[in-house]
Amino acid sequence: MALRRHQMSRWTHPFASAIFLQCVAVSASHAVELNDVATDIDATELAQLNLDSYNPDDDEDGLDLYLDVTLNGASAGLTHFYYRDDQLWASPKILQQLGFVVPANNAEAILLNSLPDLKIDYDAQQQTLNLIAPLDILNLNTTVRSTRTNKRPQATSSSGMLLNYNIYGSQTQDSMKSLSAYTELRAFNKLGVLSSTALTSANSGTGNNSDWDRHSVRLDTSWSQSFPDKLITVRAGDILTSALSWTRPTRLGGLQIGTNFSLQPYRSTTPLPSFFGTATLPSAVELYVNGLKQYNGDVPAGPFELNTAPSFSGAGTAQLIVTDALGQSTTLNFSLYDAHRLLQSDLSDWSVELGTVRKSYGIHSFDYGSDIAASGTWRYGVSDRFTAETHVEVTNGLSNGGIAGTWLLGKSGGILFASLAGSESQGQKGMQYSANYSWNDSRFNFGLSALGAYGNYRDVGTQYGSAPASRSEQISTGYSTESMGRFGISYNQVSQSERDKAQFASAYWSKSFGRKLSLSANYNHDISSAENNSLYVSASLSLDRSISLSSSVQHTDNDTLFATDLSKPASNTGGIGWRAQARHRLNTGKNNKDSTSGVAELNYRGHYGQIQAGIAGDGGDYSSYASATGAVVTMGGGLFATRQINSGFAVVSTSGIANIPVSLQNSAIGTTNSKGLLLVTPLNAYQENKIGIDPMQLPADLRIDKVNI
């Protein structure tokens, strides 16, 4: 945005008024396209034709008429007809132009009254012809209405650097101190983004031992470049391999290339329902999905297709209400099933990686394996009802590969998934299978899944860590009602090669009473060991001024814990928040020792970051703590302190003019500093972000080139 002061002349307004009046004085013309018009007769002569004086013996073909035609409520313009034997005739070519289905071998003029179920309203005085025809004798184009959008805002990039930080410190009553900092350093320009994260910690002893034990570890360092038009991101450095529901991701140091759908967030990747209908007359269309209106609009006569992205998951019902110009309504019913695991037909999602396995992540900074590993993942939408998957990974002495598929059963029969994978490691082979089925609607849900491994099944991660689960099964179901709330039960069984089999059964219930009060309860039962059984009951109440009160009771075989929490979060626009918590534990175990603890905390959220501090006590012991989060950015010739940045941001420049108010999405976000700069955050990456200024709040002598971008 460029702003500059400009001296306005006194004659500006009269000159603008003169231009405006000159524009108003220009007359407008209207052109009408004729259908097969080959005559010089003007409209006045057409209106003066006297059909009563017409003698059919004088003209074998009949009298030529050019009538203003309306077909099924839509204007078709001036069209050539014959008037003979007190009837209207038209050539096959004319009828085809209007949209009628006419036999190809018919060359003779066709009597309009011979067309089945055609309603004819001919006004000789006005020279108009109104036709209403059934759709089965018309060949009209399908009208497509869509609420989907494939907008691709042009992303822009600038050069700069960013530092995100999260610092935490604590001290106990005996002077034991600890300090930790998580940092992310990011450098960026048109060539990509270079990012590095690290975790630094320091601890001191108690009493006279004031020595600090310091430790710092690098977490991830990578360079990435994205290509939004191709939906591809290239990443080099520390990467995480792509994984499917039946595979495990692995940390590598190397190169990754693959699909990144977040580069086009307006694009939908899952199959979206289409609704088809017909309208004899111009009509209004309303679409309801599960009782909620999703679309309303108008369609002309003829077949139409409505494409939309309804906001629901699982099974649902849709109603399409078509109301024509005469007020007559027709309702069409559809069964739907929305499946986010499916890809649209002919859409691919892929990723390939090459590198060495990262070991001791979070402990050592540069600990990598010696063997090269490679992996590849591909998902493909074979149709809107079936998506195929495959995954392959190899390293020295190991190969692993498998295939899978996701099916939508019928129109609303639920989702079925199955996979089969095999591996070979040091001459030993193994197999892994998985399958699951799920179905849900707005009230009921059901799920069943199983995974198992046979033989010596291994993947790349097994070479440096634990093996995948050898067996797991899960079954769950739930139901929701307005009067009784949501409730359900589930059963889980997991077996690891190094551990005993674990079996759990659980049940839950929750209900909201209006907008302020909600209750919930959850029971977990360990089938293998009753000592791990637990019952959790909680209540949450929303009070005035954004204050919330919650209380809970958790009971196990050894103790019962009571907790009450009263809090007010800091506003997103900035301000002070606080939290107070009290906890009391009744111990019924061997030591039979009860305890009481509590927390008091204050936090502040401002334009430059967020800080919080608190005191925690447990019995006679207490500790204090504090933390700070934020970011420092250098870009566009300025240095800025702001809240932590995890998405897009921009620097607004007003050519050195200070105190210019700036808005984001029509909400005030701040004013420019003494250099005419303002950092605007957060922005939605690869989406439309409306940044602007309010010209009504600016001095009258400022010339504005642009008020929003």
Task: Please annotate each region the language model reported.
Residues 153-154, 179-191, 212-228, 368-384, ...:
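Feature captures outer-membrane beta-barrel proteins of Gram-negative bacteria and organelles
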Residues 91-97, 319-322, 600-603, 686-698:
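A short, solvent-exposed beta-strand micro-motif common in secreted/extracellular proteins
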Residues 2-4, 11-12, 17-21, 28-269, ...:
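Post-signal-peptide, soluble extracytosolic/periplasmic N-terminal scaffold domains
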Residues 668-676:
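Short, acidic Ser/Thr/Gly-rich low-complexity loop/linker segments typical of extracellular
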Residues 106-116, 330-334, 697-709:
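Structured interaction patches on ligand/partner-binding surfaces of diverse proteins
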